[in-house]
A protein has these predicted regions:
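Hydrophobic core segments of alpha-helical transmembrane domains in multi-pass membrane transport
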Residues: 6, 13, 44, 49, ...
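C-terminal ends of transmembrane helices
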Residues: 22-36, 84-98, 150-161
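Helix-coil boundary and interhelical linker segments in multi-pass alpha-helical membrane proteins
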Residues: 1-5, 57-70, 120-133, 187-190
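Generic transmembrane alpha-helix signature in multi-pass membrane proteins
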Residues: 21-29, 88-93, 105-106, 113-126
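Interfacial loop-to-transmembrane junctions
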Residues: 155-173
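Structural signature of hydrophobic alpha-helical transmembrane segments
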Residues: 3-18, 66-82, 134-146
Length: 190
């Protein structure tokens, strides 16, 4: 598979949030400020890239040879949980302000279905280790793009007058829907 097409497809065409609808909880919960969204995007890029690499290696070199591939979901969850703990400890020591801003959403990366979904999708699509890493990294980049763009739009919306009935969740969901339609326009490009 062409690596460039895989990267563009993972980040834009098959965007993990706006096309596959995985990772909606942090997308809606952390996208209030661009700085927080960028921090969450960075954490997800790190975790999803490393998780894709580690889960692919474990799948190809441990689970398949031992005929234990039916355990991939459980093993992948454990790997992702360990990686998130590492990121949490790292952020707490090095960037405490970002750690505080992410709050409860940082541990929720463990249960972020986007991270687990991409790891499982890599296996399901039969990607090799290199392709899994590229797919994981650029799916995470797509996640970061979507959450940062949404945060920027939400900051602009908060500064404007909108009808009372649209304030809060309604305008956020309408905005997310319009973003999904915009990304859907890229569907025929690859």
């Amino acid at each position: 598979m062409n690596i460039i097409l895989l990267a563009i497809s993972a980040a834009l065409v098959n965007n993990v949030i706006l096309s596959q609808f995985m990772g909606i909880c942090p997308f809606l919960g952390v996208s209030k400020k661009v700085s927080t969204a960028a921090g969450m995007g960075g954490a997800v890029i790190f975790v999803m890239t490393i998780a894709s690499a580690v889960t692919s290696v474990i799948y190809h070199f441990v689970l398949v040879p031992l005929k234990l591939s039916y355990l991939n979901t459980i093993v992948f969850i454990l790997v992702i949980a360990a990686l998130v703990q590492f990121v949490e400890m790292f952020l707490k020591k090095t960037i405490p302000s970002l750690y505080e801003a992410l709050g409860v959403y940082l541990p929720l990366i463990t249960t972020n279905c986007a991270v687990l979904g991409i790891a499982l999708k890599n296996v399901q699509d039969g990607l090799n280790i290199g392709e899994s890493i590229i797919n994981g990294m650029f799916s995470a980049v797509g996640f970061a793009i979507a959450i940062i763009v949404m945060a920027g739009i939400r900051e602009k919306i908060d500064k404007n007058d909108i009808p009372e009935s649209f304030k809060g969740a309604p305008i956020v969901l309408i905005t997310a829907g319009l973003m999904a339609i915009a990304f859907l326009g890229l569907n025929g490009s690859i």
